[in-house]
Amino acid sequence: MTPAPFRIDVLGTAHLHAYKALRDEALRCAPEAFTSDHASAVLRPAQSYAERFGAPATGTFFLGAFAADGQLLGSIGCEREARLQQRHCASVVGMMVAPHAQRGGVGRALVQACVQLAEQVAGLEQLVLTVTAANTHVVRLYERAGFRAWGLLPRAVVIQSIGHDKLHMVRWLPASPLFSAA
């Protein structure tokens, strides 16, 4: 099966309502994948996400995968640390793909585009993220993009008394002295 064509673009304020709808659905369908909860998120106005979008050159940005008809299929964020001594780090956050678009290459394309933009940010040396450890498909997706596990936080998210572990991962960027293309 060939996935439908899609394009990756930087999210801006024109995408706020589509982003909120995608996020609310992702929180409803896969609550263990996020630290935010659906009940709280649905109460947030779309405009409250505007400050997260930023601009790629700053190291804080969100990307979207768009279908040919303009529908938002998925998104991923990169949030650079604001503190001076951690400005070399950014967190990959909010990776989500609409259920009907999963396993069609959207997630892989979003991660690749995020890494490529992050590599262009002056002084940015590493990307870090957490992923639900039991979500092995997504863990493998990040590993294929060059991320490596460095720790596990047991019961990082607890939903109805059930704990979900989070795997901590890092990917060194070319600006880092620890970067190795091998």
What are these regions (language model features)?
Residues 5-7:
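Extreme N-terminal starter segment of soluble prokaryotic enzymes
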Residues 13-14, 20-21, 26-94, 98-100, ...:
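Acetyl-CoA-dependent GNAT
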Residues 87, 105, 137:
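Residues that form or flank phosphate/diphosphate-binding pockets in enzymes
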Residues 98-100, 104, 133-134:
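Active-site acidic-Proline motif in GNAT/NAT acetyltransferases
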Residues 111, 118-130:
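Conserved GNAT acetyl-CoA-binding A-motif
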Residues 125-139, 144-182:
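C-terminal "cap" of GNAT-fold acetyltransferases
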